[in-house]
């Protein structure tokens, strides 16, 4: 699981999502600090469009589970993108580069 404060970190988090697809799978949560504190983020049509465009840069095409979880008594959400490990379609690339996870670090595949 990877925490991101906002989709302002979308490019880097898509690299991590690509690594999840190439390894054991995983989930990225936007609107959550590194320490696990939920802060949420506002979700507009532009936010959803940016996420869709970023996900479409992952090749080969894969279906991901994207959820928008409302935070009570606010107008903010936690955005969850879940990737199942895809053993038979690897390697996955984002913007033409393949990624993998080593511990909690995302790095280029050799």
Predicted regions and their residues:
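Conserved N-terminal catalytic/coupling substructures associated with nucleotide/phosphate chemistry
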Residues: 1-110
């Amino acid at each position: 699981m990877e925490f991101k404060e906002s989709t302002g970190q979308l490019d880097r988090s898509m690299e991590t999502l690509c690594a999840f697809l190439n390894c054991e799978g995983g989930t990225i949560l936007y609107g959550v600090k590194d320490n696990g504190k939920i802060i949420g983020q506002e979700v507009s049509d532009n936010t959803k469009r940016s996420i869709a465009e970023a996900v479409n840069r992952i090749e080969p095409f894969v279906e991901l589970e994207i959820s928008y979880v409302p935070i009570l008594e606010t107008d903010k959400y936690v955005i969850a993108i879940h990737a199942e490990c895809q053993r038979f379609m690897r390697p996955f690339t984002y913007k033409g580069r393949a990624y993998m996870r080593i511990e909690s670090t995302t790095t280029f595949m050799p």
